[in-house]
């Protein structure tokens, strides 16, 4: 298979032609060893073994202490869309943080250490912004590392949502992650408005996907009353990647402020926030950026809003310009750019984890990661389709892929819809065999092969386990007994 040609096809929205031996371990290993496209950076991450995934204590026994002797000993981790694996660099960075803090205490804020991977603590947020700039397609001054995602959404809406008697609506998706819903709802209520009248929901035309055409049409219809558009870059349930540049351009034609929640997009797909003229965006860093559970989040504010003046919404001392921050004269001078939107001193330990995780991104590019991701997810889709075709019962497929079939409009994630009672049994079967993915009610198993650390062999092994888990328990026992008898013969 010509992998480079296949990636080119996928970038154009076309499906590659898979060889007859695609559903074999040898084929998966061939892709993993190919020099035609970027290789995995799996060696930069801590990949849990199957034994470690089952541990209930931090004390090691012989099994949990043992290193994987082969890939068969490692778990299959397809949950980077929920929490990314730990980069090995994070441990190094945390050790440097602890030693610096322990050695020079408050001097850690200002004193550079010659042999440390860290900058002085007061400069860490700016360094993380610099490292995130290529990932989201912005200049460092347009990015700030602060808070967590929902707090940043609130701060951005406090600055950019300016409802009037006529223009008061916020457009959002029909099924946002609950925290987004609560944030939008409470911002509307904070202004004394009724969410039932001021929340405008974009609904799918059919099934689970929102079309660009329907979004643009709704903007046209509601433009006179829209004060803000806030949509997800990638919808968390379906994995749909929205057409950010087209929708943003259309909002701009109507003079409507537009912001994006990029929780599932940042570090996953190529973004050009500055060039696309996005007003603001927010993202978390614990998914595809691998900075750890609840890690410090990121926000983007376009440079056209970066002069700030006094219009940074809610203020705090850390948004004050660094050059005069410690004068303490209560005369707010905002830091130019996105960092003027800071309120509090960001957590240095959180920034340490983020800086460590971002150091791995400096060894690759988002374009290379996207190329690898396109092929990984297309391979997963191909094998899922084969499994579905082999397991039709009573004329029904065992599951449905609800993510977009056009590879241009999805990231790493494929959302597999099963009947909810079946989902629990299948999910348990996956876990029993060292597979980690996640489930979302009703009936969805989200499968996300992450290009940073997942392999084509991971995909192949996952599919073999999934097909076994789809079989009713009685059939599994019969099949296992038959295989045991055959082995004795």
UniProtKB/Swiss-Prot annotation:
Cite the SUPFAM superfamilies for this sequence.
PLP-dependent transferases
The root-end lineage is:
Eukaryota, Fungi, Dikarya, Ascomycota, Pezizomycotina
**Which cofactors are reported in the record for this sequence?**
pyridoxal 5'-phosphate
* Species name: Phaeosphaeria nodorum (strain SN15 / ATCC MYA-4574 / FGSC 10173) (Glume blotch fungus)
Q: Which reaction does it catalyse?
A: L-kynurenine + H2O = anthranilate + L-alanine + H(+); 3-hydroxy-L-kynurenine + H2O = 3-hydroxyanthranilate + L-alanine + H(+)
Per the record, the similarity remark reads:
Belongs to the kynureninase family.
Query: What is this enzyme's EC?
Result: 3.7.1.3
Q: Which pathway does this polypeptide act in?
A: Amino-acid degradation; L-kynurenine degradation; L-alanine and anthranilate from L-kynurenine: step 1/1; Cofactor biosynthesis; NAD(+) biosynthesis; quinolinate from L-kynurenine: step 2/3
* Name used for this protein in its record: Kynureninase 2
Provide GO CC annotations from the record.
Answer: cytoplasm
């Amino acid at each position: 298979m010509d992998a480079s040609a296949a990636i080119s096809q996928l970038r154009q929205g076309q499906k590659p032609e898979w060889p007859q031996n695609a559903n074999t371990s040898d084929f998966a290993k061939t892709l993993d060893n190919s020099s035609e496209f970027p290789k995995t950076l799996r060696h930069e991450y801590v990949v849990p073994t199957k034994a470690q995934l089952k541990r209930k204590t931090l004390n090691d026994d012989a099994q949990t202490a043992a290193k994987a002797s082969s890939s068969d000993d490692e778990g299959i981790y397809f949950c980077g869309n929920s929490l990314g694996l730990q980069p090995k660099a994070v441990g190094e960075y945390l050790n440097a943080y602890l030693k610096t803090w322990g050695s020079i205490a408050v001097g850690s804020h200002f004193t550079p250490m010659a042999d440390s991977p860290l900058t002085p603590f007061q400069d860490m947020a700016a360094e993380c912004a610099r490292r995130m700039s290529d990932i989201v397609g912005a200049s460092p001054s347009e990015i700030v590392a602060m808070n967590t995602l929902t707090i940043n959404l609130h701060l951005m809406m406090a600055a950019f949502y300016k409802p009037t008697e006529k223009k008061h609506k916020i457009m959002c998706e029909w099924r946002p992650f609950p925290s987004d819903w609560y944030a939008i709802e409470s911002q509307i209520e904070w202004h004394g408005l009724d969410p039932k009248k001021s929340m405008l929901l974009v609904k799918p035309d059919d099934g689970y996907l929102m079309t660009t055409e329907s979004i643009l049409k709704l903007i046209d219809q509601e433009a006179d009353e829209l004060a803000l558009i806030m949509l997800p870059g990638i919808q968390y349930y379906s994995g749909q990647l929205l057409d950010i540049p087209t929708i943003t351009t259309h909002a701009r034609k109507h003079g409507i402020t537009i912001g994006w929640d990029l929780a599932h997009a940042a570090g996953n797909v190529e973004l050009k926030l500055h060039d696309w003229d996005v007003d603001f965006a927010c993202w978390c860093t614990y998914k595809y950026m691998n900075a750890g559970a609840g890690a410090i989040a990121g926000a983007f504010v376009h440079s056209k809003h970066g002069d700030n003046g006094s219009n940074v919404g809610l203020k705090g001392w850390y948004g004050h310009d660094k050059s005069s921050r410690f004068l303490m004269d209560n005369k707010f001078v905002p830091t130019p750019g996105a960092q003027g939107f800071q309120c509090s001193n960001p957590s240095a330990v959180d920034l340490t984890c983020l800086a460590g995780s971002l150091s791995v991104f400096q060894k690759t590019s988002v374009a290379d990661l996207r190329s690898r991701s396109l092929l990984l997810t297309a391979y997963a889709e191909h094998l899922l389709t084969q499994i579905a075709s082999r397991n039709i019962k009573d004329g029904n497929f065992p599951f449905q892929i609800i993510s977009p079939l056009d590879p241009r409009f999805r990231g790493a994630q494929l959302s597999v819809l099963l009947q909810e009672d079946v989902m629990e049994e299948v999910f348990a079967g996956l876990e029993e065999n060292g597979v980690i993915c996640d489930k979302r009610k009703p009936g969805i198993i989200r499968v996300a092969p992450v290009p940073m650390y997942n392999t084509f062999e991971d995909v192949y092994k996952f599919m073999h386990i999934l097909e076994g888990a789809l079989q009713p328990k009685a059939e599994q026992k019969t099949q296992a007994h038959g295989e045991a008898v055959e082995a004795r013969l």
